[in-house]
From Swiss-Prot:
Metalloprotease. Keywords: Cleavage on pair of basic residues, Disulfide bond, EGF-like domain, Glycoprotein, Hydrolase, Metal-binding, Metalloprotease, Protease, Secreted, Signal, Zinc, Zymogen. Glycans are attached at N67, N185, N337, N370. This is Zinc metalloproteinase nas-20. The gene is nas-20. The keyword Metal-binding applies. It is found in: Secreted. SUPFAM superfamilies: Metalloproteases ('zincins'), catalytic domain.
Length: 379
């Protein structure tokens, strides 16, 4: 069986043969040299005593990567250099390719998810944690004695993103790893794959469409897909060949007065960690040159803990459509109902999780001109 997969990763330069990840202690400097890249952009892998549900999880992760990069995966139990994916005591992976070796990548039930599968594969491709970036002190307050938080000699090919699948959650019981911007308290540790995660992976492995005869004018932060140069990879809420369409997206026209909308259904609360997140998108439009304002007014049935890992809502107000804006999943967070303003038109709202995270409501309006409103709480 042969599986072809494409995906993006963070570039590292440094020391080989170290373990990454959850429930595993590591050397403080674990970056990799370029020789740790997989040759010909192809990884060989196979499953070993891996439960069927975890196999399905990895196939989803591989298919995702295949659709977003020029990388390929080949299922090959006889390969001299390969990744053996098995059940273990924790979720971890070696960094990069180890020539002539069968290297282990493990999952355990207490940490297994689609996002974790992507996270560990990206380690095997040569990507370090977000908290190990050389610029992390501009964005995080960390305990440098923590073995997972040592700065590595990374090549920062994309902006720092609090929503990266490679970034650990904040530590809710201490100040060992907290965001300098407190609005990202619940965003760190998300199990979503961020747009910049794939951009990074593509840049690291040189995946691009530079030699393709047709150049596409991708819109709204999108870029030509190295997996299929006849289409663009699109940011949240956009689709179509050039990322200028909203098929399957709720398109709402903002007015000068506050209007209300949301997602309302009767499913019971719950989570399914082994599947890809399901998304519902809203695109709020307004006259050209306007500022669009949005505020969440109700959250119900979301799984709430110290990070919005399995479900949540993102009001994408950041000017850079590729970056992750603060995530919301808990109505006891004093930031959850802040008014967000953006000149991005349309203004995109993303709800993620599954149909068991049932209910959120929001209000929206536009203000003529480029107005920047200070965040406010609803009373």
């Amino acid at each position: 069986m042969k599986i072809t997969v494409n995906f993006l990763l963070v570039a590292l330069i440094g020391v080989p043969s170290v373990l990454s990840d959850r429930h595993i202690t590591r050397d403080k400097r674990q970056a990799m040299r370029d020789y740790a890249k997989w040759e010909n952009n192809k990884m060989s892998l196979f499953f070993y005593n891996l439960p069927l549900e975890m196999q399905a999880m990895f196939r989803d992760a591989i298919n995702y990567l295949e659709n977003h990069t020029c990388l390929k995966f080949e299922y090959n139990e006889n390969a001299e250099t390969a990744v053996r994916i098995r059940k273990g005591n924790g979720c971890y992976s070696l960094y990069g390719m180890h020539a002539g070796e069968v290297q282990d990548l493990t999952l355990d039930y207490n940490c297994a998810s689609f996002g974790t599968a992507v996270h560990e594969i990206m380690h095997a491709l040569g990507i370090a944690h977000g908290q190990a970036r050389s610029d992390r002190d501009d964005y995080l307050i960390v305990d440098s004695t923590n073995s997972n938080d040592g700065i590595e000699n990374t090549e920062n090919l994309v902006p720092f993103d609090y929503g990266s699948v490679m970034l650990y959650a904040r530590d809710p019981h201490s100040d060992k790893r907290i965001p300098i911007d407190p609005e990202y308290n619940f965003t760190m540790g998300s199990l979503r794959v961020a747009f910049y995660d794939m951009v990074l992976l593509n840049k690291f492995y040189g995946c691009n469409c530079d030699n393709h005869p047709r150049k596409l004018d991708c819109k709204n932060g999108g870029y030509q897909n190295p997996a299929n140069c006849e289409e663009c990879l699109c940011t949240d809420g956009f689709n179509g060949q050039l990322c200028d369409q909203h098929e399957g997206v709720y398109v709402l026209e903002a007015k000068k007065e506050w209007d209300a909308s949301g997602v309302r259904n009767n499913y019971r609360k719950g989570i399914e960690t082994n599947t890809m997140p399901e998304y519902t998108y809203f695109a709020l439009t307004a006259p050209e040159g306007s500022t669009i304002e949005v505020r969440i007014t109700k959250l119900s049935g979301f799984f709430c803990q110290h990070t919005c890992d399995y479900n949540g809502v993102e009001l994408k107000y950041k000017t850079d459509r590729r970056i992750v804006s603060p995530l919301v999943c808990c109505d006891n967070d004093n930031l959850w109902n802040k008014t967000r303003s953006s000149t991005n038109n349309p203004f995109i709202i993303a709800k993620y999780g599954n149909n068991r995270t049932p209910h959120f409501e929001f209000e929206y309006r536009y203000i003529p001109g480029n107005a920047t409103a200070a965040p406010e709480e609803n009373n």
